[in-house]
Amino acid sequence: PMFGSAIDGSNTDITHTGSDSTLTVSWSGFIDPLTGFSPGTHSGIASYQVAVEDGAGNSIMTWTDAGDTNTWQATDLSLSNGLMYHVLIRAVDGAGNLSTAVSTNGITVDTDSPVSGTVFDGAEGDMDWANLDSILTFNWNNFSDTISGLSYYEYAVGTTSGGAETMPWTSASRTDSTVTLGNLALVNTTTYYISVRAIDSVANVSSVATSDGFTLDMDVPSIYYVNEGSISTDLDIQNVDSVLSSSWLGTDIIPGSGI
């Protein structure tokens, strides 16, 4: 038979897998041609055989019958994280003749979760207090994945550390590092926490990183008094024409952000 081509995956060629025990391969273009020969002189393709090698050419799975199909999954393998593997395909005709074997371009195993980063309340740096109950901005950094790469993020907002009571887990692009949410109904004096997790290209999920929290403070401070003069004395008249002094005292509610 004449050889065709093969890809890692079932429909499109993939470069990474999150499994260390299974590999899926698809192939096409293998033929046992009759053109130029008398009818019936070629027996046709009867089945295919599949094998698996590592990047150094060491056998991981010896030649195995895959039947007459064009997609097959190798199971019960023992693959190593971070290593590349190749699946080999060859066709067998009705007379037992073997085609030249073809190899996929390789697939790398990634069973590592992404590295978690740091989450901050606010657009830049980290804030502890906010005075808007409908808008919330937060940012994060230092999430990473060294094998298959980050695919996207998910974030949640809660009233407990790591919780999602206020907003359920929601997707963000892998290029995002700051999110602003609107149309919220945050509650005054309540502390909120932002949680972020990263998902890589083969669906491994990082541990959750959570901000240290911020508290909503929408209560205005109170002014106790304003005096002309010192704190202890309120002047109505003075005999100095070059100096004017004043004193005052204000307070914020408890728990509030303070003056």
What feature does the model see in each segment?
Residues S26-H42, N139-I147, S247-G256:
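Acidic, Ser/Thr
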Residues P1-G9, D13-T15, D32, E53, ...:
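Flexible, low-complexity linkers/stalks enriched in Thr/Pro that connect modular domains
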Residues N81-G82, L132, N188-T189, V240:
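Surface-exposed loops/turns
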Residues G44-Y48, G149-Y153, S257-I259:
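Solvent-exposed loop segments of extracellular immunoglobulin-like
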Residues S47-S80, M127, E154-V187, L235:
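Recognizes extended acidic, P/S/T-rich segments that occur
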Residues S21-V25, S134-F138, S242-S246:
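Structural beta-strand segments of beta-rich domains
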